[in-house]
């Protein structure tokens, strides 16, 4: 997603990149400094400007970043207003709730963003007028639990790789490296946007749904967002 935004013309000042950044120079990486999601694909780490590493942030810090609360520890925050469209891509691990749904997004070994906390964050951002529209694209197990809490928040749309009760699956296998490199949700997302940056949200959801294997791609809060047939990714990828 970072590369797609850069290709669309956005500067690093318009992007907040939070990753652990523990792959490129990992001792077992046969190509130091290189991160790919397919054999022979481009080096996604090259030129990337990392704002924060996940291990350096708490989930409270994450909420402060979303709500524009700048500090010495958090110099880079979301400086948005009610006229801005905000795109969030989250790829990681998730856990189920006690009842199998409405779980959490794992943040670190000892921290997580619960569905309830995510819902509170969305409602607070909405009440403070921090976005015109906000699109969440979440690739994580049980991510539908977080998607559910977006219901009722005006202008928020959430598309998840799995429903609240199931895991999402890896898909892109490297025979050379003997590791899973990506997943069908993310690879389809990238291919769909790269081939048509103005793709409608309906068509994007449909492509994700039919191509993602092993889990059910879900979409939440459509009634409070707008027409999925006329609303497009162009609202997020086209420079103002």
What are these regions (language model features)?
Residues 1-240:
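Cysteine endopeptidase catalytic domains of the caspase/legumain-like
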